[in-house]
Amino acid sequence: MAVKERVGVVVSDKMQKTVVVAVENRAPHPKYGKIVVKTRRYKAHDENNEAKVGDRVRIRETRPLSRTKRWVIAEILSPRTA
Protein backbone atom coordinates (compact mmCIF):
# COMPACT_ATOMS: atom_id res chain seq x y z
CA MET A 1 0.00 0.00 0.00
CA ALA A 2 1.30 3.44 -0.92
CA VAL A 3 2.35 5.88 1.79
CA LYS A 4 0.04 8.90 1.96
CA GLU A 5 1.73 12.28 1.79
CA ARG A 6 0.32 15.80 1.91
CA VAL A 7 1.80 19.28 1.49
CA GLY A 8 0.51 22.10 3.66
CA VAL A 9 1.28 25.13 5.78
CA VAL A 10 1.96 25.07 9.52
CA VAL A 11 -0.79 27.10 11.25
CA SER A 12 0.07 26.33 14.89
CA ASP A 13 3.24 25.28 16.72
CA LYS A 14 2.16 25.90 20.31
CA MET A 15 2.29 22.25 21.39
CA GLN A 16 5.44 20.37 22.28
CA LYS A 17 6.65 18.13 19.42
CA THR A 18 3.38 18.70 17.53
CA VAL A 19 2.31 21.13 14.81
CA VAL A 20 -1.03 21.71 13.09
CA VAL A 21 -0.77 21.63 9.30
CA ALA A 22 -3.51 23.05 7.04
CA VAL A 23 -3.80 21.21 3.71
CA GLU A 24 -5.86 22.74 0.89
CA ASN A 25 -7.80 20.52 -1.50
CA ARG A 26 -9.06 22.12 -4.71
CA ALA A 27 -11.74 20.31 -6.70
CA PRO A 28 -14.53 21.33 -9.07
CA HIS A 29 -18.06 21.37 -7.70
CA PRO A 30 -19.88 18.31 -9.10
CA LYS A 31 -22.87 20.28 -10.41
CA TYR A 32 -21.66 23.83 -11.01
CA GLY A 33 -18.03 23.27 -11.95
CA LYS A 34 -16.63 26.10 -9.82
CA ILE A 35 -13.32 25.28 -8.13
CA VAL A 36 -14.05 24.81 -4.43
CA VAL A 37 -11.23 25.06 -1.88
CA LYS A 38 -11.57 22.84 1.18
CA THR A 39 -9.06 23.01 4.03
CA ARG A 40 -8.27 20.07 6.28
CA ARG A 41 -6.14 20.41 9.43
CA TYR A 42 -3.82 17.59 10.49
CA LYS A 43 -1.80 17.27 13.69
CA ALA A 44 1.72 16.16 12.81
CA HIS A 45 4.65 14.99 14.94
CA ASP A 46 7.68 17.30 14.94
CA GLU A 47 10.36 15.53 16.99
CA ASN A 48 12.86 18.42 17.16
CA ASN A 49 10.39 21.34 17.16
CA GLU A 50 11.90 22.59 13.87
CA ALA A 51 8.74 23.72 12.04
CA LYS A 52 7.38 27.20 12.73
CA VAL A 53 4.12 28.93 11.81
CA GLY A 54 4.08 29.76 8.10
CA ASP A 55 6.48 26.99 7.03
CA ARG A 56 5.46 24.88 4.03
CA VAL A 57 5.93 21.22 4.99
CA ARG A 58 5.41 17.72 3.63
CA ILE A 59 3.71 15.32 6.06
CA ARG A 60 3.59 11.53 5.85
CA GLU A 61 1.03 9.16 7.37
CA THR A 62 2.31 6.91 10.15
CA ARG A 63 1.05 4.73 12.98
CA PRO A 64 -1.17 6.42 15.58
CA LEU A 65 1.04 8.46 17.90
CA SER A 66 -1.79 9.79 20.09
CA ARG A 67 -5.56 10.15 20.02
CA THR A 68 -5.53 12.64 17.14
CA LYS A 69 -1.97 12.47 15.75
CA ARG A 70 -1.32 10.12 12.81
CA TRP A 71 1.07 12.17 10.68
CA VAL A 72 4.78 13.00 10.92
CA ILE A 73 6.72 15.81 9.25
CA ALA A 74 8.76 14.34 6.40
CA GLU A 75 10.51 17.57 5.40
CA ILE A 76 10.29 21.34 5.60
CA LEU A 77 9.92 22.50 1.99
CA SER A 78 10.26 26.24 2.49
CA PRO A 79 10.64 28.13 5.75
CA ARG A 80 8.50 31.20 6.29
CA THR A 81 9.84 34.49 5.11
CA ALA A 82 10.50 37.05 7.82
From Swiss-Prot:
Domain of life where this protein originates: Bacteria
Any Pfam family hit: Ribosomal_S17
Disulphide-bonded residues: none
Gene3D superfamilies to which the protein is assigned, alphabetical: Nucleic acid-binding proteins
Single GO BP term: translation
UniProtKB keywords: Ribonucleoprotein, Ribosomal protein, RNA-binding, rRNA-binding
UniProt-listed PROSITE patterns: RIBOSOMAL_S17
Xref: InterPro entries: NA-bd_OB-fold, Ribosomal_uS17, Ribosomal_uS17_bact/chlr, Ribosomal_uS17_CS
Annotated GO CC locations: cytosolic small ribosomal subunit
Listed GO MF terms: rRNA binding; structural constituent of ribosome
Subunit record text: Part of the 30S ribosomal subunit.
Biological role stated in the UniProt entry: One of the primary rRNA binding proteins, it binds specifically to the 5'-end of 16S ribosomal RNA.
Family: Belongs to the universal ribosomal protein uS17 family.
Name this protein carries in UniProt: Small ribosomal subunit protein uS17
Species in which this protein is naturally found: Thermosynechococcus vestitus (strain NIES-2133 / IAM M-273 / BP-1)
